[in-house]
Amino acid sequence: MTIKRHGVGPRLSQAVVHGDTVYLAGMVATDPSADAKGQTQQILKKIDETLAAVGSHKSKILAATVYVANMGIYADMNAAWDAWIDPANTPARATVEARLASPKYLVEIMATAAIQ
């Protein structure tokens, strides 16, 4: 099987396709001045765009890991997630409290999805 990388940078690729699976890099908000719900909405939009670029869709997400700067924002993050996710195709998901790359970031999401 071939490996195809998308959005390749010096440190990481935004997405890596292997067979019928796409692995997304951890994504953070474009505008980190937004609150947790706003940052999550920005990230989910980036996920939609990245999945579309490789021929997938949020309904095909197999697993997601959500990192939050503190569990106090869990409900706000979930409000954005619940409004976005396909309720008939919810993925396996974990939410982890973690120190992110910059204190401005409140949420980071990684996902793996099927392509077919």
Task: Please report, for each region that a protein language model flagged, where it lies by residue.
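N-terminal presequence-like segments and the immediate start of the first folded domain
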Residues: 1-62, 68-116
